[in-house]
């Protein structure tokens, strides 16, 4: 599937009634934006579908009718090992991650990126990791103050900037990059399961934006939540429930 990054960007803007993500199309994004977009079945929209609708689309317009599959299971990958992340890519395809981006750390043709340990933080940037190469030469990276990665190996990344380099918008990101998979730019995640959206399937939800903020329960061992829905529209069989938590070993 080739989902439209432009649609997610426009969807994740403040609506005319003031609701939604508090940002405009040129603002930075948030780590939870893509999670909300996918888990609320507002996306993704196939690029080919969006291309035919783009001229008439506004952030207030609902295009969820063009979403064919809805995410039903998403796994956080923070604190995962390199081998576990590789397995996630093998099992479920690309994963969402973020790193600290500055043009200073790119090589000359913008196909390789390495930010050494101890480097100052720059702007966070979200990417899709689609593969890896354990033998990708460390010599391909730009030496920062004479420093290269200690070892070969890099993740293959699909960026969202179009065909801006000789790899058609892909680039290699060193395994040893300082901020990739760090707590600075969490969360990283993979979509582990989806369901086909048909006329017989409906997602009942109180809002469509996902987790627009987070909070902790420090002293409680259990938490109870209540959502109230109206099932009078003919959708009267509840076969699953989704909720979000960052607790380890949760399913």
Q: Model segments located where?
A:
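Predominantly the structural core of cysteine protease catalytic domains
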Residues: 7-154, 158, 162-238, 242-249
């Amino acid at each position: 599937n080739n989902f439209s990054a432009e649609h997610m960007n426009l969807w994740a803007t403040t609506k005319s009634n003031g609701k939604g993500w508090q940002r405009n199309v040129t603002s930075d994004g948030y780590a939870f934006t893509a999670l909300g977009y996918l888990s609320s079945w507002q996306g993704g929209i196939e690029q080919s579908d969006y291309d035919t609708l783009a001229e008439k689309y506004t952030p207030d317009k609902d295009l969820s009718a063009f979403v064919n599959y809805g995410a039903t299971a998403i796994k956080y990958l923070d604190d995962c090992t390199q081998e576990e992340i590789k397995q996630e890519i093998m099992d479920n395809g690309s994963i969402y991650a973020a790193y600290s981006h500055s043009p200073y750390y790119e090589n000359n043709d913008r196909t390789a990126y390495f930010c050494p340990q101890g480097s100052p933080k720059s702007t966070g940037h979200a990417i899709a990791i689609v593969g890896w190469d354990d033998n990708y030469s460390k010599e391909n990276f730009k030496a920062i103050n004479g420093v290269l990665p200690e070892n070969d190996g890099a993740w293959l990344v699909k960026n969202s900037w179009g065909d801006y380099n000789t790899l058609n918008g892909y680039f290699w990101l060193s395994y040893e990059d300082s901020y990739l998979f760090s707590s600075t730019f969490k969360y990283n995640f993979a979509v582990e399961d989806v369901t086909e959206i048909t006329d017989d399937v409906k997602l009942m939800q109180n809002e469509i934006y996902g987790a627009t903020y987070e909070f902790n329960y420090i002293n409680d061992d259990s938490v109870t939540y209540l959502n109230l829905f109206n099932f009078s529209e003919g959708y009267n069989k509840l076969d699953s429930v989704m909720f979000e938590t960052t607790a380890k070993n949760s399913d």
